Amino acid sequence: MKDALVLQSRVPAHPDSRCWFLAWNPTGTLLASCGGDRKIRIWGTEGDSWICKSVLSEGHQRTVRKVAWSPCGNYLASASFDATTCIWKKNQDDFECVTTLEGHENEVKSVAWAPSGNLLATCSRDKSVWVWEVDEEDEYECVSVLNSHTQDVKHVVWHPSQELLASASYDDTVKLYQEEGDDWVCCATLEGHESTVWSIAFDPSGQRLASCSDDRTVRIWRQYLPGNEQGVACSGSDPSWKCVCTLSGFHTRTIYDVAWCQLTGALATACGDDAIRVFEEDPGSDPQQPTFSLTAHLRQAHSQDVNCVAWNPKEAGLLASCSDDGEVAFWEYHQPAGL
């Protein structure tokens, strides 16, 4: 297990600052990082080395907490503690801030694009989730403000193929939203974590959702459609989500991020104990009660809290991580034999 994660490269991405989050572009050729220095950096390869291709420093007045690429790869959205979200347009190696989205009362904690590229979601410490519509002229309009959470909303993520939105909060819950008529509504609340839910990730099929928490567990939730063979109760025509697996006893501190590889199904976590862990579903495990094994555990992946893990969308096994130590690390994950 010790050789399952091999360091490929390490770069001082945000020196003297925290590096908060990472996002690969859709082709897996560029990685965006953001940090407490108010900057966004774009990383790419030259030969065998990862180098900084661009620095986006003009958009925000405070910490940049999250970044997200549009599905077409031509835009990057950044969420900041200055209560704004910037939309950057890519022009070869340069990026220009073309729009600043305002409206949240305080820190914007996360931003995510829908798979169509026509919708954007943001969430904030003001307890709200906003859904924005993007038109052909690149104009952004808020079409819904969702106030389902009772505390700070930490993370938003879209289903990989449907317009289904999920959010994670300091109120210990995960909520799911869909469009009904002309508005967005909360269609499910996932309860079970005993403390803040920091991050969530859909599996490649979108039928399962992983959540990670301050309670040091990862929970796997499965979607059940009305009339399902397992007899899981559903409310009307809305699917039901049920916790089918809890990964506990593996992490010694808060789990800040969880990432589900869209190519292999491997599940990576970023933890406050400075470690990165990878889990794989056991072969032949029951889909209704899946079991997962720890296949990689790198104890000193960083010198401080690990904030984010991100699988490359095109190159299986390439994992990036970032930390309070300001560094970004690139790892090669080797799947154990027999899986």
Swiss-Prot record:
GO cellular component terms, A-Z: cytoplasm; cytosolic [4Fe-4S] assembly targeting complex; MMXD complex
InterPro entries: CIAO1/Cia1, WD40/YVTN_repeat-like_dom_sf, WD40_repeat_CS, WD40_repeat_dom_sf, WD40_rpt
The protein's name in its UniProt record: Probable cytosolic iron-sulfur protein assembly protein CIAO1
Keyword RNA-binding attributed: no
Biological process (GO), any one: chromosome segregation
Keyword list, A-Z: Chromosome partition, Cytoplasm, Repeat, WD repeat
The protein's assembly and partners: Component of the CIA complex. Interacts with CIAO2A and forms a complex with CIAO2B and MMS19; the interactions with CIAO2A and CIAO2B are mutually exclusive. Interacts with CHD1L, ERCC2, IREB2 and POLD1. Component of the MMXD complex, which includes CIAO1, ERCC2, CIAO2B, MMS19 and SLC25A5. Interacts with WT1. Interacts with CIAO3. Interacts (via LYR motif) with HSC20.
Functional summary from the UniProt entry: Key component of the cytosolic iron-sulfur protein assembly (CIA) complex, a multiprotein complex that mediates the incorporation of iron-sulfur cluster into extramitochondrial Fe/S proteins. As a CIA complex component, interacts specifically with CIAO2A or CIAO2B and MMS19 to assist different branches of iron-sulfur protein assembly, depending of its interactors. The complex CIAO1:CIAO2B:MMS19 binds to and facilitates the assembly of most cytosolic-nuclear Fe/S proteins. CIAO1:CIAO2A specifically matures ACO1 and stabilizes IREB2.
The organism of origin for this protein: Rattus norvegicus
Motif LYR motif: where in chain: 176-178
Subcellular location(s) per record: Cytoplasm
Similarity comment text for this entry: Belongs to the WD repeat CIA1 family.
WD repeat ranges per the UniProt record: 14-53, 59-98, 103-142, 148-187, 192-231, 250-289, 301-339
